Amino acid sequence: MMIDIKNAASSIVDLVKTSVDYFKNLRSDDSGYKMKYDFSLPKKFLQINLDNMPFISSFLKVTELDKKLNISNNKDSNHLRGLVNIASTCYMNSIIQCFAHIKELYIYFKKDKTQKLMSEPYNQDKLFILFGELIISLWKIDDSSPLYPYIFKEKIGNMNPLFRGPIPNDAKDLLTFILMQLHEELNHPNNINNFNQMNNMSNCNMQMNKKAMFNSFVNDFQHNYRSIISELFFGLNYTETRCLCCNSALYNYQTFNFLIFPLAQVLNNKMQLGNVIDNTVTLDECFQYNQIYSPLNDYYCTVCRQNSQGKYATFLSVLPNIIIIILNRGEGLQYNVKIDFDENLDLKNYVEYFKEDSFYELIGVVSHYGQSGANGHFMARCKSPIDGFWYLYNDAIIQKLEYFTKENFLQGNPYILFYKKTKFG
């Protein structure tokens, strides 16, 4: 693909300079600063044809990347809004769009109680205010103009140096930062440190009955460590450590807000079993791999009180309402491992409790185009909670995909999957 880099770079520099200058002027006007995302972009910006402009992070265009997809225009989709790439922020835009398509987040931030919380003076330096305003602005009906998330980008850069400046980043890193930061801010102030206390409690009481430990952990969590983030994204798993000498087992419960599957290791395990046809692994194979025991060669058993051989594995105990799956490909040749997944996901064979409530449907996919997570280009495919159709978000460009097909969704490298319980919402 031939691109005039000089002209592309000139257009991008003009765009960024114009927009940054505009925001500097906007921020000096208190009345105009109240709504940080809903505004008319400068005339000079609107004159730039985004459909024909290469993107900052990778100089890749959606028409080239997805020319085989069955895509139609979104002229009738006035509830959709894109996000402008403001210097290698495709990683941020794709994550925000996936969050924005979770209707429970929108409902939470629109509630009077949350709006009051957002207006309190002592909360004005918190990330959840900018995040909530951005989510609400993305669903402004009858306004399909793209949003410019400069202030949100500036905020996360000030809070975490990893996201400072025009540097490409890994979407996974921003996802984990947002989840934990919002949970910490929206959790009750008196209970912020309870998570570490609970982990210490579970580690110190390994000899407790497994069921009793589960009940104790869940009760403490529900009473002391809840937020909208934990309600949506937190699940519970446990690590079983077993002595191969006396067969005693110790259990340690902990919360999780996403799962990471190392695709190269999953493929290697599949090869050892002789089940390899190509370099593709399925989500089922990822969950099966996650439950394989790993050896402990220098293990001290507190029951038989001696050094012995042991093994350990981690199992899912309670599933979250929205499960986030990160597909870690590694670098180099490992990056060529492919993933196969469906729109529906049944996890009843992999969870300890509430098996009847373990069915999920896909609502968002972050895909990556490049050879490592921190370079290349990120795009999001999201299912609209309004019309039920799928849309491709390539920064400011939105294109309709209509329905889920593997041909559409396995394009590029699917990297982060968002699944929602079918009985939830």
Question: What annotation goes with each model-predicted range?
Answer:
Residues 14-78, 99, 112-122, 201-204, ...:
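Exposed substrate/partner-binding surface patches
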Residues 45, 54-72, 101, 105-255, ...:
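Papain-like cysteine protease catalytic cores
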Residues 83-98, 127, 166-177, 374-378, ...:
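Active-site nucleophilic cysteine motif
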Residues 2-12, 237-240, 249:
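Long non-globular sequence segments
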Residues 83, 236-239, 294-297:
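Residue-level signal for mature regions of secreted extracellular proteins and peptides
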